[in-house]
Amino acid sequence: MENPQIKVIVTGVTGMVGEGVMLEALRSPFVKEVLAISRKPSGHSHPKLKEYFLADFYQPEEIKEVVKDYDACLFCLGVSSVGMKEEEFRRKTYDLTLGFAAQMPKNISFSYI
């Protein structure tokens, strides 16, 4: 029996956690494609890797069509709260994440990592 394969979106691929998640997804026989959505290149090359550059994660509406055929999103974008006011931290984590998630297909599995 053949392994079912999924298409996965990963954010935060230029950071420690996101890069690790992306590399594991690329190694997995259960993943047929990885779409890395980021502001800059990941610095990696792989046959399963596609990259999409999003200049402003606070205005992610342009990705709605790009992500429509994906099965899962592993959202690894984040910042440290050190030295940050609560309002700014909430905007950079909670608000940004919800805005991004709102662009995903209704049947997608969305995980905040």
Residue ranges and their predicted role:
Residues 32, 71, 108:
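Conserved acidic residues
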